[in-house]
């Protein structure tokens, strides 16, 4: 768990939640000035500066970790995710699922990269930490934000999409079934509508 601070009581609660499953909780407290160059651009009422820790995992987490699975706190896991965990990350920075807003031209125009790279949702990310360290993903995120702050709207998600534009692998929708697909539906004209339908029913 990466956080600016957690009380002993909070740590105990989290350890007690993990203990029955034979899991250990590790806590990482980054330096207070680590996020000083960033600012919240959107959803400020429900997102804190801590969202930018996601850009900095390669410098926060120990080098003994080669990869890490990041999950937003509202993710519900309904089955075995070992298949996703075992995704081949050779030569890429992360495995991810396309975002529900991937077809919005505005995103690519604003961020200045080609639409053919698509746009992923950062709520579920299988991160290749070795790749991030080698390619200094954290430094790239900082530099982009400092250089083009006006381009950023969806906070760290925008930054990671730019930096990992050509260095990611997409996985099936079932690994990150975003709530918008249930609220707005999926265009039934798409060729793989039947596959999408199955993933909606069995995420």
Describe the predicted segments one by one:
Residues 5-12, 104:
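Short, charged/polar "capping" segments at the starts of alpha-helices
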Residues 1-5, 96-97:
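Short internal beta-strands
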Residues 9-13, 81, 181-183:
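A short acidic (Asp/Glu
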Residues 29-35, 50-104, 126-127, 133-135:
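GT-A fold catalytic core of metal-dependent nucleotide-sugar glycosyltransferases
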Residues 9-10, 15-60:
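Active-site-proximal specificity loops/subdomain of glycosyltransferases
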Residues 37-49, 108-113, 185-190:
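Short, surface-exposed amphipathic charged segments that create phosphate/polyanion-binding patches used
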Residues 95-102, 117-203:
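Catalytic core and acceptor-binding pocket of nucleotide-sugar-dependent glycosyltransferases
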Residues 17-18, 85-89, 143:
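Glycine-rich, phosphate-binding/catalytic loops in enzymes
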């Amino acid at each position: 768990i990466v956080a600016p601070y957690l009380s002993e009581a909070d740590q105990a609660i989290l350890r007690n939640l993990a203990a029955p499953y034979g899991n250990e909780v590790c806590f990482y407290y980054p330096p207070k000035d680590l996020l000083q160059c960033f600012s919240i651009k959107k959803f400020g009422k429900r997102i804190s500066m801590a969202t930018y820790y996601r850009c900095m995992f390669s410098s926060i987490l120990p080098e003994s970790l080669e990869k890490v699975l990041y999950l937003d706190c509202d993710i519900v896991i309904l089955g075995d995710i070992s298949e996703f965990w075992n995704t081949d990350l050779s030569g890429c920075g992360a495995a991810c699922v396309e975002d529900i807003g991937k077809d919005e031209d505005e995103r690519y125009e604003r961020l200045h990269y080609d639409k053919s790279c698509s746009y992923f949702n950062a709520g579920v990310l299988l991160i290749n930490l070795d790749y991030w360290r080698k390619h200094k993903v954290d430094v790239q995120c900082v530099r982009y934000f400092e250089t083009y702050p006006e381009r950023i709207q969806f906070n760290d998600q925008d930054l990671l999409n730019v930096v990992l534009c050509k260095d990611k692998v997409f996985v099936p929708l079932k690994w990150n079934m975003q709530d918008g697909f249930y609220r707005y539906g999926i265009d039934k004209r798409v060729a793989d509508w039947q596959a999408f339908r199955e993933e909606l029913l069995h995420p």
